[in-house]
Amino acid sequence: MRLCILFAVNAFILEVISTSHNLAIAMICAPMMIHMVGHNLLIPMTLSYALKDYAKVTGTAGSIFGAIYYVVIAAVTYLVSKIHGPTISNFALLCFVLSISSAISFYCIWILYKKKKSNIPN
């Protein structure tokens, strides 16, 4: 979520302040590279933990999760193509909306986790 906010701030900076071409590329690519490194480290660890009780179907379940992931990515990419405009403000707004939806999702999952944890007897 922080990287989406950083990306949105960078987008507004690029729109308001005239910057060099190399700085603009760095301001866009740096947060994306950090995100991809985190994503490539996090997803395999998360899936291995989530699927440890389902060792017989780990490959199938992993491919289903991968398919769902790519459907979500395709939907976001489609949304980006529909709100495309002459400025980068629309994309920054999309990053902000995705950050808010991520925060709401995290909060809902956290509440469910706390309820589940409180129902487990010690």
Curated annotation (Swiss-Prot):
Xref: InterPro entries: MFS_trans_sf
Domain of life: Bacteria
Record Gene3D superfamilies: Multidrug resistance protein D
Name of the protein: Putative uncharacterized protein RC0923
Organism: Rickettsia conorii (strain ATCC VR-613 / Malish 7)
